[in-house]
Amino acid sequence: MQAYIPQLISELKEFYGDDLYNLESYSNIPEHLEALAQRMHIGVRESHSFILTEISNYHKDYLGKKEVINPKEFSIDDCRQTIANEYGFASWTALNQQPNLLYNYDFEKAINFLLDGNLPAIRKVISEKPELLTERSKYGHNATLLNYAGSNGVEFWRQQVPLNLPEIVTYLLEVGADKTAIMKVYGGEFNLSLIHI
């Protein structure tokens, strides 16, 4: 399986490491995102360019302003707000008002199979659990599996493109994925219907 992974995304994935994938290590989503915010704060203090880029993509006060982020002044609360926004929540407070927010591990695995271009694994998991076609992310953006095929508007580290994306999208549509399914991103609601699929 192959995917186009921009260098920035590769660096992010390497930096966060297992914290991105070992979801079972956390009792709920807020606890997991707290761990990511703590890791981000380390990256800020170490002035990693890829972390500053991540922040400039999601923190409302720094959108497109990577050069004005001062690592010495960027607090853990700023990191929490960045992570909350990246994962589709309006604020860290809004995220933490949902302590029972739990992962659907099968859905998360299916997303990773999609983004890695592992069509055989996607076919297998969908045949075993067809409800994954209509499942929505527990993150604030509520993306479906097909929304993740858009490779944008979702978690920064997941913004990569499998080289066999057309085949994956064709398969998902053939087995019933809804191309009009809405996800909440960029301050509005969007779907993939504008893309000719």
Label for each model-derived stretch:
Residues 103-112, 134-156, 181-194:
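Ankyrin-repeat boundary/"N-cap" motif
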Residues 95, 172, 177-185:
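Charged low-complexity stretches with an acidic bias
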Residues 1-122, 128:
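Long, non-globular segments of proteins
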Residues 121, 164-168:
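Conserved ankyrin/ankyrin-like repeat signature
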Residues 158-162:
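Short consensus segments that form the blades of beta-propeller domains
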Residues 126-132, 167-178:
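Ankyrin repeat domain, specifically the short helix-to-loop turn at the C-terminus of the second helix
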